[in-house]
Swiss-Prot record:
Keywords: Aminoacyl-tRNA synthetase, ATP-binding, Cytoplasm, Ligase, Nucleotide-binding, Protein biosynthesis. The gene is proS. It comes from Bacillus cereus (strain AH187). GO terms for cellular component: cytosol. Its main location: cytoplasm. GO terms for molecular function: aminoacyl-tRNA deacylase activity; ATP binding; catalytic activity, acting on a protein; proline-tRNA ligase activity; transferase activity. This is Proline--tRNA ligase. PANTHER family: MITOCHONDRIAL RIBOSOME PROTEIN L39/PROLYL-TRNA LIGASE FAMILY MEMBER (PTHR42753), PROLINE--TRNA LIGASE (PTHR42753:SF2). It is found in: Cytoplasm. Catalyzes the attachment of proline to tRNA(Pro) in a two-step reaction: proline is first activated by ATP to form Pro-AMP and then transferred to the acceptor end of tRNA(Pro). As ProRS can inadvertently accommodate and process non-cognate amino acids such as alanine and cysteine, to avoid such errors it has two additional distinct editing activities against alanine. One activity is designated as 'pretransfer' editing and involves the tRNA(Pro)-independent hydrolysis of activated Ala-AMP. Belongs to the class-II aminoacyl-tRNA synthetase family. ProS type 1 subfamily.
């Protein structure tokens, strides 16, 4: 492709609203442009990268036995109502009405549509297992779109769905697609980890996220320093043991703590360690209010609270709800005096506290010498806190460290969550009606493009891995007015294309500095500069990833480039 004919508008300045490198560079290099908040156009170079990621995804999905189809973006509300998610999915689901006032959703995901499709067509175990996938635009009304393609309102996603007669069949396909995902992200050149995850609004169990390691990631990964264990911090169980001291219990005492609300403030004011304080929080668990206790140096993990109750929705109670429930402000909350009809659950660590401290449910006061079970009753002790760095790894090997990650893929064993709700059944080999067993497998295709850009860049621009680069080689005749340089550049361009390489020829009448700056910004793997030594049959070859350059004879160029790109 000749650069003079390409639509690739570059920017010299960083856009003010672009916070992270991938967003900045994809805009500056002319790979995309914003249409509205969280909505982007892919320009020609960006689209080439997107298509290459799509191709890798398709190759690995088909190798894993999945078959491609395409489902509608507009989905009838009745299907979502049938599954129960019309009401539980939340405000991220974009809803609309047609001219006849019939309700629809713009697809955030396609479980309902695929289940409806398959239940009408697959009636026997003889047609199972079946794995179908699509690459389709998705829509989510994000409250705060940010980070460019990483959190948008419209994005490209590969979603696959598998249907099975047995759990063993699901396990087999799940493992196969898990490996396919690992192959996809490895082929894209990404540094990633597959981690144990929470299924969230998707439902189901046994789920893994594929996380690209990046400091700008919105998720925290807890991983072992000596084993392969890795999990989203929300899902990492705490296996610590807590020893109760033999300190004698003291008499409960209420003390004034004016203007001291946070644990750090209270512990400093009372000269008591944070680990001896009891942090009390009120959660709304499917409309039921529950008091949750953790140690003062720990944080409540709301996903674990949700899992204790098998709840659909868990959120912090509002200040007004806390006031009505306990007649106090949030900063003065405590378990003492909570009436019997309000359930108290506590993290295991709370049980070991002796002569601790808690809020007194009265503004400006706390209790000291608090002892669980003597001063208040707990209905259940369980794992309720976030794991911390330095904790023992849940697999028993090593200690936990943290890293940030960008989620680019997620695989779920849905089980019969959707098939039972939507009456999607088949006849088994005994002629009995059974619900279809399902799996679900998603990849953020456009998000993967951003994740690659986030991992592969330097101070001068993008540095694309060869598998997804829009072109393999960038040929730059420095002076287009020079017949020797121009003709050599075109000859190299043509010969490399004949060898199967994708080549970009900078045939613009621009200054050398502009051409080189754009080349660095675009980030193609190899740059061939045709300069003053063209008359001698010599060009300069530069590797974008390393910055290494070498003068090469034209007759040796194809072999040289082949060694770089092998």
């Amino acid at each position: 492709m000749k650069q003079s004919m390409v639509f690739s508008p570059t920017l010299r300045e960083v856009p003010a609203d672009a916070e992270i490198k991938s967003h900045q560079l994809l805009l500056r290099a002319g790979f995309m442009r914003q249409n509205a908040s969280g909505i982007y156009s892919f320009l020609p170079f960006g689209l080439k990268v997107l298509h290459k990621v799509e191709r890798i995804v398709r190759e690995e999905m088909e190798r894993a036995g999945a078959v491609e189809l395409l489902m509608p973006a507009m989905q009838a509300a009745e299907l979502w109502q049938e599954s129960g998610r019309w009401y539980s999915y939340g405000s991220e689901l974009m809803r609309m009405k047609d001219r006849n006032a019939r309700e629809f959703a713009l697809g955030a995901t396609h479980e309902e549509v695929i289940t409806d499709l398959v239940r009408d067509e697959v009636k026997s175990y003889k047609k199972l297992p079946l794995t179908l996938y699509q690459i389709q635009t998705k829509f989510r009304d994000e409250q705060r779109p940010r980070f460019g393609l990483l959190r948008g309102r419209e994005f490209l996603m590969k979603d696959a769905y598998s249907f099975h007669a047995t759990q063993e069949s699901l396990d087999e396909v799940y493992d196969r697609l898990y490996k396919a995902y690992s192959n996809i992200f490895a082929r894209c050149g990404l540094n990633f980890r597959a981690v144990i995850a929470d299924s969230g609004a998707m439902g189901g169990k046994d789920t893994h996220e594929f996380m690209v390691l990046s400091d700008v990631g919105e998720d925290t990964i807890a991983y072992s320093d000596t084993s392969d264990y890795a999990a989203n911090i929300e899902m990492a169980p705490v296996v610590a043991t807590y020893t109760k001291s033999d300190e004698a219990e003291k008499a409960l005492e209420k003390v004034a703590t004016p203007d001291q609300k946070a644990i750090e403030e209270v512990s400093a004011f009372l000269n008591i360690e944070a680990e001896k304080c009891i942090k009390s929080m009120v959660f709304k668990v499917d409309e039921k209010l529950v008091v949750v206790l953790v140690r003062g140096d720990h944080e409540v993990n709301d996903v674990k609270v949700k899992n204790v109750y098998g709840a659909s929705v868990v959120e912090l109670a509002s200040h007004e709800e806390v006031k009505e429930l306990l007649n106090c402000e949030v900063g003065s909350l405590g378990p003492i005096g909570v009436t019997g009809d309000i359930e108290i659950i506590a993290d295991h660590a709370v049980a070991s506290i002796v002569n601790g401290c808690s809020g007194a449910n009265e503004e400006g006061f706390h209790y000291v010498n608090v002892n669980p079970e003597r001063d208040f009753k707990v209905s259940q002790y369980t794992d309720l806190r976030f794991i911390q760095e330095g904790d023992q790894s849940p697999d028993g090997n090593g200690t936990i460290l943290f890293a940030r990650g960008i989620e680019v893929g997620h695989v779920f064993k849905l089980g019969t969550r959707y098939s039972e709700a939507m009456n999607a059944t088949f006849l088994d080999e005994n002629g009995k009606t059974q619900p279809l067993i399902m799996g679900c497998y998603g990849i953020g295709v456009s998000r993967t493009v951003a994740a690659i850009a986030e991992q592969f860049n330097d101070e001068n621009g993008l540095v694309w891995p060869k598998a997804v680069a829009p072109f393999h080689v960038h040929v730059i005749p420095v002076n287009m007015k020079s017949d020797a340089q121009r003709e050599m550049g075109e000859n190299i361009y043509n010969s490399l294309q004949e060898q199967g390489y994708e080549v970009l020829l900078d045939d613009r009448a621009e200054r050398a500095g502009v051409k080189f700056a754009d080349a660095d910004l675009f980030g193609l793997p190899v740059r061939v500069t045709v300069g003053k030594k063209a008359d001698e049959g010599i060009v300069e070859v530069k590797v974008r990833a390393t910055g290494e350059s070498e003068e090469v004879k034209v007759e040796e160029l194809q072999t040289y480039i082949a060694n770089i790109l092998k």
